[in-house]
Amino acid sequence: MEQYEKVEKIGEGTYGVVYKALDKATNETIALKKIRLEQEDEGVPSTAIREISLLKEMNHGNIVRLHDVVHSEKRIYLVFEYLDLDLKKFMDSCPEFAKNPTLIKSYLYQILHGVAYCHSHRVLHRDLKPQNLLIDRRTNALKLADFGLARAFGIPVRTFTHEVVTLWYRAPEILLGARQYSTPVDVWSVGCIFAEMVNQKPLFPGDSEIDELFKIFRILGTPNEQSWPGVSCLPDFKTAFPRWQAQDLATVVPNLDPAGLDLLSKMLRYEPSKRITARQALEHEYFKDLEVVQ
């Protein structure tokens, strides 16, 4: 750790404190993420070290670069490139963003690019949300942070500061207790983020797992064996769920054009195997007039 000098604490993420720091060898500003481990008495699990080491190989313009992993007996520090703006902060400080369909399209394209790259390397995110989509102010490049950390460390129910980890972007198969799930969970999250960029408010802001499910059901309709074959076999599915009818997405996201609505509906498909993939989404007609904003 002698190589890195902490400058200031910049935030508290899902896994621990994040510092702005200086790499004394290169004089570069970096982000230092201190991972707080659940079973601290047992030290750093070797599986976590292996998982994280694989992430150093990930190299893509829309992924936050992991430069280094430093671990001692009890804790692990991840050294990332430093970016001080995230999509949540940007949306909060810039409400007129919703009136810029070109920038929304560019950001969505970049998110999907990063997700498709990770999925092609068999890495899932599982916790995509506006707070871990970082923006480079100089280039307008958008980069995904924290990819792969869920597999290495699990997703806690609460952060170490006891904030509840958000459920707003969580796919219905996870909420319904599916043991096996895969890359479609990230596409669902991206769909939720897409709608939020357009509406300037979250699509499904649930405050508990059941509230989250019901917020989804009220808009997309309560799933059944017709709309989602196999749903009734998921551990937390109840036949007693209230039965809501699906709303027309055009009334839910009124400022989105028909191509955007078509893409959004394909990202928010209930049946995971029928959900569009990130790679397919990049080819969607919504992006045909895309100019990546530089």
Swiss-Prot record:
Keyword match Transport: no
Single annotated GO MF: cyclin binding
Protein origin, superkingdom: Eukaryota
Alphabetic keyword roster: ATP-binding, Cell cycle, Cell division, Kinase, Mitosis, Nucleotide-binding, Phosphoprotein, Serine/threonine-protein kinase, Transferase
Enzyme Commission code: 2.7.11.22, 2.7.11.23
Record PTM Phosphothreonine, positions in chain: 14, 161
Positions of the Protein kinase domain: 4-287
Record text on activity regulation: Phosphorylation at Thr-14 or Tyr-15 inactivates the enzyme, while phosphorylation at Thr-161 activates it.
Protein name (record): Cell division control protein 2 homolog
Provenance organism: Zea mays (Maize)
Gene name, Swiss-Prot/TrEMBL: CDC2
